[in-house]
Amino acid sequence: MAGCDDGEILLLAGYPFHMKQPAERMSQLFDKYDSILRQVLGSEVVGVYSMGSGAIPGMVGSPMIDILLAMRNAPPTEDQLSKLKEIGIGLIGDGKSPHDPSDTWFQNLDFPTQGNFEEFKANGAHPPDGYLGRLIVHFCPYQSQFVHNSLCYVKYLKQNKDAFNRYRAVKIEGARMQCDGNEIKGGESGMSAFRKYKMHKSKVVKDLIEESKTWGEKEGNFNLPRELM
């Protein structure tokens, strides 16, 4: 896109939006949590996957990562909630994700004592919401359609250049409209710049989700990982 600086970081009400994601460090963070989640939750874990923008190489956006945690049971039991709390992971609100009824979502509120997370700290402390080191965990039953659709969506955007470009373009457009210091912010709705950015891209995201479902239904385009079948 013209005028796009790969090294540029925009701020949306204080939330960083990277024109070039710190992909290697995001992958390192995912690997650390993949290992710890499997250790803590044991055999109830079927699979741990990267989802959302952070799972799509070359995509712009927040450096936060989204982890899709495919479980044999869902929603989480009290014992599982306790185990997640011990590694610094707590429910977002009441845990009911707006994405899907089968999705119980969490965020990391502190780093686990297992492993070394020093490189992900900000000024020696757990980073603020929206920054590298923060993440969302989607706790879902492994056979749910949400798991299937989330993984199919990522593969579709990895393989379809037009879909990738449309998603990237609307994200950049929305971020530039709402970045700190930009006067083109619309009326005083009381809605945060980050929320306005999310709404700006929602129509394109909805279209891409439906496209990915149609694409995934064609033989040979998408297969679930073996452990989910």
Predicted feature descriptions by range:
Residues 1-49:
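Helical scaffold of the NTase/Pol beta-like nucleotidyltransferase catalytic core
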Residues 9-12, 59-62, 129, 148:
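Short, flexible turn/loop "capping" segments at secondary-structure junctions
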Residues 15, 63-67, 133-135:
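Short amphipathic alpha-helical segments
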Residues 15-25, 68-72, 152-157:
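Short histidine-centered catalytic/ligand-binding loop motif
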Residues 36-78:
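Active-site nucleotide-donor binding segment shared across nucleotidyl transfer reactions
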Residues 79-88:
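Short amphipathic alpha-helices in soluble, non-transmembrane regions
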Residues 88-143:
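Conserved catalytic core of two-metal-ion nucleotidyltransferases
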Residues 134-229:
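Catalytic cores of NTP-dependent nucleotidyl/adenyl transfer enzymes across multiple folds
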